[in-house]
């Protein structure tokens, strides 16, 4: 939830963004089709995740001059590991990740207790992976990016 609104906010803030996936051809195009045109889509890199190649390739496409402040946001553990391997800040998406094992409709049908259990398990697994922050969904990204900015001001590195 909140993905398109968050992307609009990032665009207003002039934050360059890329979409990374491992799909090729028509599948990749179908997955990226709802995204705004200003988002650079990256498909199929020579080395599969968790190699850092996809992240570095995306940063080169975005013409990023430094890794400082670059953030990867995903619910996919292998892509998050790729971001960690590339030296990026990483934010894991708990409730909309493959770690929860349900789609949005199934999630909404779960009891509050079952949602909390799945959210907690996904959060623990994401932190065990080594991500820097975990949020439930993209609607919380602004606050999370502000937190990372404060951590960077204190000298913390990914």
In which residue ranges do the predicted regions lie?
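Active-site substrate-binding loop(s) of clan PA
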Residues: 18
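Asp-based, Mg2+/Mn2+-dependent phosphohydrolase catalytic module
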Residues: 4, 8-15, 24-25, 30-71, ...
